[in-house]
């Protein structure tokens, strides 16, 4: 099952076809449905696309304190899409993107897949990335929290691996428009592990993902979260924007509520889905290339979206799965019964992103 088609109303077909005819090279490769979605949801207009980009670029002079290391059309466009073509908001996000990197120089030193810290995090499944997209065309990212071996991976390196993964994925214009979903499985995540999630490092993650990256997040789903994760969530709430809070869903062990938002056919069996269990090494092999190894140092430094697209299936056949801890929420698909939603649980579906 592919992404849901968003077809124009009959009376708008001629206008819609005209927009496709005027499509710029920046929209090349997008499906007609995605182009129409960008027009309806993001206010993307091919007639003024280059003017929109230039107006954001013209604002750079107002922030001489920031080094804008990349200002090409394709790069600025992703910030416009992330902010629904509100130019001032798009520029603010662009400035925060580079300012975050200036303020956290150590995080972005040797910022590539073969950096030892990033490589370890990737191999341990941080993050997991499902091959197929959901029914809205969104990419699904997974985090199995209990797999965090604190003697092996620092939280900062896990965050770096997530940010690097997003940098690779956001090169795909379809994902700039359709966005992402994040599912965090807290099964077997101990209180001792949780005690390492200090306010300062959580704030660092929120600033990097919420305030400084041009991605549209359609939802962050907590599954099997213990009471102390609820407490941590209360702790970080002041750092979250209202829009972000509305997109955090606390499912507990109620996978039925998860399936109301993400159909089981797009989920691995750990989340009651119909897909096979997730192989924790899949995304690491995609980024690291055919020389991926759990044990040997990796020396190949290049990666790009085209390489990811064309080699992923071959690598999956060549490499065996890496055994990791699994979620306790494995159930047979279709056997879940409807449960009453808890008063404090956000389980409203998101049909469109703000």
UniProtKB/Swiss-Prot annotation:
What topology does the record note for this protein and the membrane?
Answer: Peripheral membrane protein
> Does the keyword field hold Isomerase?
no
- Record's compositionally biased regions (Polar residues): 345-354
Which molecular-function annotation in GO is an example for this chain? phosphatidylinositol bisphosphate binding
Segments carrying the region annotation (Disordered) are 317-354
Q: Which SMART domains match?
A: CRAL_TRIO_N (SM01100), SEC14 (SM00516)
The tissues where this chain's protein is expressed are given as:
Expressed in brain with no expression detected in non-neuronal tissues (at protein level).
Question: Cellular component per GO?
Answer: clathrin-coated vesicle; early endosome membrane; endosome; trans-Golgi network
Q: Which UniProt keywords apply?
A: Cytoplasmic vesicle, Endosome, Golgi apparatus, Lipid-binding, Membrane
Q: The CRAL-TRIO domain covers which part of the protein? A: 118-279
Q: Which GO BP terms, alphabetically?
A: lysosome organization
Give its localization. Golgi apparatus, trans-Golgi network membrane; Early endosome membrane; Cytoplasmic vesicle, Clathrin-coated vesicle
Keyword field contains NADP: no
Which Gene3D superfamilies does the record match to this protein?
Answer: Alpha-tocopherol transfer, CRAL-TRIO lipid binding domain, N-terminal domain of phosphatidylinositol transfer protein sec14p
Q: Where is the composition biased (Basic and acidic residues)?
A: 335-344
Sorted alphabetically, which PANTHER family does this protein's record hold? Answer: ALPHA-TOCOPHEROL TRANSFER PROTEIN-RELATED (PTHR10174), CLAVESIN-1 (PTHR10174:SF72)
Q: How does it assemble?
A: Forms a complex with clathrin heavy chain and gamma-adaptin.
What does the UniProt entry state concerning the protein's domains?
The CRAL-TRIO domain is required for targeting to the membrane and for binding PtdIns(3,5)P2.
Also noted in the record is: Binding to PtdIns(3,5)P2 is not required for localization.
Which function does this protein serve?
Required for normal morphology of late endosomes and/or lysosomes in neurons. Binds phosphatidylinositol 3,5-bisphosphate (PtdIns(3,5)P2).
The entry's protein name is: Clavesin-1
Give the organism, scientific name.
Rattus norvegicus (Rat)
């Amino acid at each position: 099952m592919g992404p849901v088609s968003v077809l124009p109303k009959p009376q708008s077909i001629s206008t819609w076809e005209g927009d496709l005819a005027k499509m710029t090279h920046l929209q090349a490769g997008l499906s007609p449905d995605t182009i129409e979605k960008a027009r309806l949801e993001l206010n993307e207009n091919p007639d003024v696309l280059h003017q929109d980009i230039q107006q954001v670029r013209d604002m750079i002079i107002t922030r001489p304190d920031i080094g804008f290391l990349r200002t090409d059309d394709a790069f600025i466009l992703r910030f416009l899409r992330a902010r629904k073509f509100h130019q001032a908001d798009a520029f603010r996000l662009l400035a925060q993107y580079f300012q975050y990197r200036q303020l956290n120089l150590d995080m972005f030193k040797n910022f590539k897949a073969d950096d030892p810290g990033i490589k370890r995090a990737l191999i341990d499944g941080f993050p997991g990335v499902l091959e197929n997209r959901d029914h809205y065309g969104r990419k699904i990212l997974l985090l199995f929290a209990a797999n965090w071996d604190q003697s092996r991976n620092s939280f900062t390196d896990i965050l770096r691996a997530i940010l690097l993964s997003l940098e690779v994925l956001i090169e795909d214009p379809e994902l700039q428009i359709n966005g992402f979903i994040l599912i965090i499985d807290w099964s077997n995540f101990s209180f001792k592990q949780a005690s390492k999630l200090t306010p300062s490092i959580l704030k660092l993650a929120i600033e990097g993902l919420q305030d400084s990256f041009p991605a549209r997040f359609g939802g962050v789903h907590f599954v099997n979260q213990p009471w102390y994760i609820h407490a941590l969530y209360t702790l970080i709430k002041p750092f979250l924007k209202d829009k972000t809070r509305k997109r955090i869903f606390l499912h507990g062990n109620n996978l039925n509520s998860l399936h109301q938002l993400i159909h089981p056919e797009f989920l691995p069996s750990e989340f009651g889905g119909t897909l096979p269990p997730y192989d924790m090494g899949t995304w690491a092999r995609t980024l690291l290339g055919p020389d991926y190894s759990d044990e040997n140092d990796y020396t190949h430094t290049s990666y790009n979206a085209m390489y990811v697209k064309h080699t992923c299936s071959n690598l999956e056949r060549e490499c065996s799965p890496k055994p990791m801890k699994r979620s306790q929420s494995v159930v047979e698909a279709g056997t879940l019964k409807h449960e009453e939603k808890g008063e404090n649980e956000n389980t409203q579906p998101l049909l469109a992103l703000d």
